[in-house]
Amino acid sequence: MIKVDNAVILAAGASSRFAPLSYERHKALIEVKGEVLIERQIRQLREAGVKDIYVVTGYKSEQFSYLVEKFGVNLVHNSEYATRNNHSSIHVVRDVLSNSYICSADNYFAENPFNAYEEGAFYSGIYSEGYTKEWCMETDDEGYIIDVKIGGSDAWYMLGHVFWDEKFSKRFTEILEQSYNAPDIVDKLWEDIYIEHIQELKMKLKKYDADYIFEFDTLDELREFDSSYVRDTRSSILKDIAESLGVNEAELKGFQAVKAVDNRATGFKFVCKG
């Protein structure tokens, strides 16, 4: 068994699909069922014995400053969050990666998935019955991931936390350093880089039940999980819109981000009864 050294929580992205709530507050800092998403994750890590936690910030980074005093975490700012994909967040913490959890700040774990010790590198997965647009994993007889494809049916797909052992961390950061200034890397997720080198970056699939790990890409999805958001969106933008239209917040739904050609969010659209 391998002792977990630390955890990295990725919280740099703008989460444009979560508009308009993400315009006012970083998605990682919204309250779900009475707990702030990232605070719940930090507590779960601490309960598992993982004390050394790094939070990579970018968009609305100032909103995370209170976490230092409240939880004693380390904040690391990713100044390239708006021009590069999430591989840049891995790059800014490359010197602390060893036997490390890599977490998404906006995941909600129904139960604590973290441990003080792990067997080896893994990526968490949820099973999809029928078709999914998610990143689907294929494994060998020993459980190692040998292929990943976007979209699939009756398959295990990537969702949740990841664990990198020291060997994985060392080789991944070497590959990242070697390719960091290449023009074609800018838009790549760290997962893209992993898949390109999947033969040498050994990682197993760790399977979870569908009701264990949750992710909310839109306000509509959040409402399905936390019904308190149906009547109270906690958004001053939506409260003003509802008042202007003479409706209650529950009648505003079907939220979609409107994006420019460079994929930058420029607004949002929604459906309103009547």
Where are the regions a protein language model picked out?
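Conserved beta-loop-beta/alpha segment of the NTase-like Rossmann-fold superfamily
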Residues: S65-W135
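ATP-binding glycine-rich loop module of kinase domains
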Residues: K269-G274
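N-terminal nucleotide-binding beta1-loop-alpha1 segment
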Residues: M1-Y23, G72
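A conserved acidic beta->alpha catalytic loop
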Residues: K60-E62
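Conserved alpha/beta core of the MobA/IspD/sugar-nucleotide pyrophosphorylase nucleotidyltransferase superfamily
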Residues: I2-A7, Y157-V261
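Conserved core of the sugar-phosphate nucleotidyltransferase
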Residues: A110-I185
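Short acidic/polar active-site loop segments enriched in Thr and Asp
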Residues: D5, K51, S98
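A short, N-terminal amphipathic alpha-helix
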Residues: E35-D52, V92
